[in-house]
């Protein structure tokens, strides 16, 4: 069952020069109890989508969607107050740069205790006194911090990046959310610390059944932990599929470029071996290409790519491309004409 179901999400930002469309018709579906990945380079709209889900919306954002459901509740149709209450209870987010999200003038212990909501107390009334401190210690132990006394007595600037990230995870799970969004949780972390964070999130998914959405610009690093991956480019869906299928046989050129950009160290590389890169640069927000936004950089682009590609589906594999790769032309035509693979966002309402 889909815990989060988003169809045709558009995010525009009102500026002095008019509206700029950042996210263009994105679909996203998260099944309950799974770890899903949202992959794309900087500027693809990953963080914007995550903030919209968490209701961290600015006044100059214009948000529309055919469907924006969380557990069968249409979030965009709720009043701001009801949406804030629902999201605050059911969804948590771990932001980038954890140390910058903490109050530098207050100790970690006080911030963590203040972040624990009263409704999570489910014990006898006489155990109320001091329960938040006990709960804070329990949360720190759960995220792998054994020496809780030093951490709780420290200020944010006295923590390492890894400790700061673990503290942010402890704060995020204090309200026992059904959905946890981790916005590039291993950004700027050492490889060993990043591995600890991924293992921690994975154990939370397995032990507590928490649904997790990971955003990243490194498709290989999160492919080891995610059940499903969706790829974005400049605010548009390119491809979505179960992780193993997506990595082994991507149908969109951009997904293939992301995979090729990661060096394969299983075999020795030759002297001055060039890394796999996609030619060109991402367009600026004010000058997005019409149609497929990858068109100017795509090695397979043709005139038809000036039209926005339809979103097609073959079994569990969804992609938006006029000229998909890793598909035999004959089989592709047979599959796409035999059944209606064009996704209809309004069909399930």
From Swiss-Prot:
Places the protein is found: Cell inner membrane
Statement: the UniProt record of this protein carries the keyword Secreted: no
Chief location category: membrane
CDD domains: ABC_NikE_OppD_transporters
Short name of any one Pfam family annotated for the protein: oligo_HPY
Keyword entries, A-Z: ATP-binding, Cell inner membrane, Cell membrane, Membrane, Nucleotide-binding, Peptide transport, Protein transport, Transport
Single biological process term from Gene Ontology: protein transport
One CC-aspect GO term: plasma membrane
Domain ABC transporter: 1-259
Residues given in the record as ATP binding sites: 40-47
Protein transport listed as a keyword: yes
SUPFAM superfamilies (alphabetical): P-loop containing nucleoside triphosphate hydrolases
Record-linked Gene3D superfamilies: P-loop containing nucleotide triphosphate hydrolases
GO molecular function: ATP binding; ATP hydrolysis activity
Membrane topology summary: Peripheral membrane protein
Described purpose of this protein according to its UniProt entry: Involved in a peptide intake transport system that plays a role in the resistance to antimicrobial peptides.
PANTHER family, per database record: OLIGOPEPTIDE TRANSPORT ATP-BINDING PROTEIN APPD, PUTRESCINE EXPORT SYSTEM ATP-BINDING PROTEIN SAPD
Family label: Belongs to the ABC transporter superfamily.
Protein name: Peptide transport system ATP-binding protein SapD
UniProt source species: Haemophilus influenzae (strain ATCC 51907 / DSM 11121 / KW20 / Rd)
Gene that this sequence comes from: sapD
């Amino acid at each position: 069952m889909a815990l989060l179901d988003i169809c045709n999400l558009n995010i525009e930002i009102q500026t002095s020069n008019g509206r700029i469309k950042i996210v263009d018709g994105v679909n996203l579906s998260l099944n309950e109890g799974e770890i899903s990945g949202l992959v794309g380079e900087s500027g693809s709209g990953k963080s914007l989508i995550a903030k919209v889900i968490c209701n961290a919306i600015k006044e100059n954002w214009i948000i529309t969607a055919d469907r924006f459901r969380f557990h069968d509740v249409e979030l965009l149709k709720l009043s701001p107050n009801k949406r804030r209450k629902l999201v605050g209870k059911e969804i948590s987010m771990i932001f980038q740069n954890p140390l910058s999200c903490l109050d530098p003038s207050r100790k970690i212990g006080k911030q963590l205790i203040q972040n624990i909501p009263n409704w999570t107390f489910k014990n006898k009334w006489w155990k109320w006194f001091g329960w938040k401190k006990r709960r804070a210690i329990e949360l720190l132990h759960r995220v792998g911090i054994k020496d809780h006394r030093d951490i709780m007595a420290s200020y944010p600037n006295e923590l390492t990046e890894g400790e700061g990230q673990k503290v942010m995870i402890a704060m995020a799970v204090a309200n026992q959310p059904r959905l946890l969004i981790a916005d590039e949780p291993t950004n700027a972390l050492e490889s060993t610390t990043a591995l600890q964070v991924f293992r921690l999130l994975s154990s939370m998914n397995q032990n507590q059944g928490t649904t997790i959405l990971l955003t990243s610009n490194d498709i290989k690093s999160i492919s080891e932990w995610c059940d499903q991956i969706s790829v974005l480019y400049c605010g548009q869906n390119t491809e979505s599929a179960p992780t193993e299928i997506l990595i082994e046989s991507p149908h969109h050129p951009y997904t293939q470029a992301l995979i090729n950009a990661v060096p394969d160290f299983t075999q020795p590389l030759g002297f001055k071996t060039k890394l796999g890169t996609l030619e060109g640069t991402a367009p600026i927000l004010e000058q997005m290409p019409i149609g497929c936004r990858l068109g100017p950089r795509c090695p397979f682009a043709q005139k038809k790519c000036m039209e926005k590609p339809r979103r097609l589906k073959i079994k569990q594999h969804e992609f938006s491309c006029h000229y998909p790769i890793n598909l035999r032309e004959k089989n592709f035509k047979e599959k796409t004409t035999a059944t209606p693979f064009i996704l209809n966002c309004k069909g399930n309402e």
